[in-house]
Amino acid sequence: MSENLIIFNAKVVTPLGFSARKGKEMAELRILEKATVEVVDGIITYVGPNRGEVRDGYYHHFWHYNARGKCLLPGFVDSHTHFVFGGERAEEFSWRLKGESYMSIMQRGGGIASTVQATRELSFIHLRSKAEGLLKKMTAMGITTVEGKSGYGLNRETELLQLKVMRSLNKDEGVRVDIVPTFLGAHALPDEYRERPDDYIDFLIRELLPVIQRDSLAEFCDVFCEEGVFSIEQSRRLLTAAGDYGLLPKLHADEIVPLGGAELAAELGAVSADHLLHASDAGIEAMARKGVVATLLPLTAFALKEPYARGRDMIDAGCAVALATDLNPGSCFSGSIPLTFALACIHMQLTVEEAITALTLNGAAALNRADSIGSIEVGKKGDFVVLDSDNYHILPYYVGMNCVNTTIKGGMLYPSV
């Protein structure tokens, strides 16, 4: 559903462009005081100075919104999440606090394996209800587009079920966020294929990719390219096959060790490589050359007490950097956009302006959507965030506190209270 809307007396704060902003470009924002934004049928048709027609009644067939000088930003794009899952893993959080590593928990049957079991046990209705509840919490923080991954089924039935849940939610007009589905069947090895990773990759290629293409269930294929999970060669083979079925490549890359995932992402022309805590200088440079978006997930590093990805170095090397929450039931049960802003600026040394670009236009680019969302420009969707202030610097300054007053999706207003 979309509406006709006129927003006036706004302080527009937005990156510009229809592709990712790289390097120094990330700090460049357009700022318009006392601005009007016009939305017709959910699409932006005017951005500029306040217009007298608002006072003269020209817009009588529009909803009117007086921003009263507050900042109007593009809707936030959360380009990496795992929001469709069963169960929780709160006890594992306590284990990590006592010093146990994420990988050691996985090796003794916890981690992803425990979520896989819980997800396989849920019906479509229960899985959908849980996912919808999480989305409502996320949209209150200004998220208007969210990526969601499968990867907690690791079998034919439940991987497809996760993707069908996302499709169902995407068609529901009551769900006020656009969902971009990603197939992450190569998230871990299921017990059925323990010690047989090559056979499992064959299974994904043979049994799942054709169905996903036939039923249009996903746009991207992702893989957990990591030591002890899927190798460079296994990841290359799956993503190459996925491309033959029309899925664009993404990678969980260099999260735990410097395996060379960033280099593989550049080799394959991936849309994005994500995590990148241990990406090499050569990998960063290769991603910058090939235009691979570096999607950084500071909440996960925070929750795991790991070193943060080198966001400042990546931007200085000419990369396009995006930020996302990585909401998931294990390593990061958080969809907090406010805390993402704060951690990125404090620990990754992004400026506020760069962080805004990373969570809007570059997040859109990480989902192959920079032509339609991510900035406030004519021709793009009417997706916005109204802050509680005329000062956008509050985004990281209000550490972990939601400063979104209103979310606007397709020209429809949703107060955050």
From Swiss-Prot:
Residues that, per the record, bind Fe(3+): H80, H82, H252, D326
A Gene Ontology molecular function term of the record: imidazolonepropionase activity
Keyword Iron included in the entry's annotation: yes
UniProt: 4-imidazolone-5-propanoate binding residues: R89, Y152, H187, E255, S331
Protein source organism: Bacteroides fragilis (strain YCH46)
Location, primary (coarse class): cytoplasm
Name under which the protein is recorded: Imidazolonepropionase
CC cofactor note: Binds 1 zinc or iron ion per subunit.
